[in-house]
Each structure stands twice: as C-alpha cells, then as structure tokens.
C-alpha cells in the first residue's frame, strides 16, 4: 500500500512538472532550422528566479555530404514540448528548482551560423546564431533579473557556448558548464594536434572564419 501511495505521488509530481513545460517558437523569420521551418525551443518554468539554459549538441555538418548523412530530425524543429527535459543535467537543475530552457540543435552549425548553402539544389539554412539571438531576446528580462543564471552544453552545444559568449557575458555573473572543448586558445592548440580521421577537416571548418564576436569574451 505504501509503495502504491509513493508511486502515485511520483506520478503526480511528474505530471505537474511536464504540465509546466511550453514549446515556444522563435520570432525572427530568419531564426529557422536547416529545413527553413521556424525553430522551436522548450521553456519549463518554476516558481524560482534561477534559470538554466541548455544548448543541445550532436555533431556538425562540415560538408554537403556530411549534412546529407545527418538524420532528418536534426534538420527540423521539435514539436515535443518536453524535448530535452530527459537529459540528466537538465533533470538535475529542474530538481534544484531552476527554470529550464532547452535549445534544440537543428542547424548542424555549432549554434553559430548565419548563412545558407545549396545542397543538391535546395537552400539549406545554417542559422544557429540567429536562433540563439532570438531566444535570448525573448527571455532577456528573465535572464537580467535571474538570481542565478547557468548556461551549459554538450559536444556541439558546448562549443556553441563559446561562439555565443558575447551574448552570455551581457548578464550579471553568468555561470558556464562546458563538457567538451570550446573554442578558446588552449583548446585550439590541442585540437590542432589531431591529424587523423575527420579532424583535419573539422578543425578547418571550426577555425577558418571565426566570428568577430568570439574574440576576447572569456
């Protein structure tokens, strides 16, 4: 009987948590996923004044061939209002009472692109930067008034933190959790030692044309 009671409580808490999550759309008409559809992101609010923002990772497209090999789900907006809330670090911050924002990765460009390319004659949007700018703009007042503000990302999302450091640094005392290399001088020295497999081409993609806003923010 006690077990059933505890299970009911757990289910009630889970339902309440999921009910608070909202699927939001970007407002800028250029803040789109690679397939050209308006990007979406997830906001799960609590009664706290603390905010946790998670940049999703998942590789990158360094050429038309590598883009075509990526899953279709990585090129379009999510329609799931609970998307990304299952990630362990996201769940952890939710348990701590933080408001949570999940930025899905649908542009294959390390959350930093602002250009288009033709792939098999079709326009493909690499507008990750535009998506991040739009989301930050929509949540700007929340971030400015946050008691604690934490940004995190994994893999491509972690590198995306570095590419968007100029946006992050605008807020008071932001904290950053990066689980892999971001693009600072020290990590670049290490990456340039990787000369086997796809790393030569990947590094060329990463470092060939660094955005001006990436310089000097850490």
Over which residues does each language-model region extend?
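Sec-dependent signal peptide recognition
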Residues: 2-10
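A domain-start/cap signature at the N-terminus of enzymes
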Residues: 19-50
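Flexible loop/turn segments at secondary-structure boundaries
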Residues: 60-62, 109-110, 158-160, 183-186
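Short glycine-rich or small-residue beta-strand-to-loop segments that form or flank ligand, phosphate
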Residues: 103, 149-154
């Amino acid at each position: 009987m006690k077990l059933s009671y505890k299970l009911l409580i757990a289910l009630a808490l889970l339902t309440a948590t999921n009910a608070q999550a909202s699927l939001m759309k970007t407002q800028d008409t250029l803040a789109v996923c690679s397939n050209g559809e308006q990007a979406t992101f997830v906001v799960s609010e609590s009664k706290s004044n603390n905010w946790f923002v998670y940049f999703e990772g998942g590789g990158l497209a360094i050429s038309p061939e590598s883009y075509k090999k990526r899953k279709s789900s990585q090129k379009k907006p999510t329609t799931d209002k609970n998307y990304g809330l299952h990630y362990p670090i996201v769940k952890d911050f939710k348990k701590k009472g933080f408001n949570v924002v999940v930025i899905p990765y649908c542009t294959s460009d390390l959350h930093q692109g602002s250009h288009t390319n033709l792939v098999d004659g079709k326009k493909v949007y690499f507008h990750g930067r535009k998506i991040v700018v739009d989301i930050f703009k929509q949540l700007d007042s929340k971030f400015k008034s946050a008691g604690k503000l934490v940004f995190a990302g994994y893999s491509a999302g972690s590198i995306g933190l570095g590419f968007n450091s100029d946006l992050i640094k605008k807020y008071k005392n932001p904290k950053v959790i990066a689980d892999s290399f971001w693009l600072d001088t020290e990590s670049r020295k290490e990456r340039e030692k990787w000369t086997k497999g796809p790393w030569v081409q990947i590094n060329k993609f990463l470092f060939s044309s660094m955005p001006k806003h990436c310089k000097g923010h850490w």
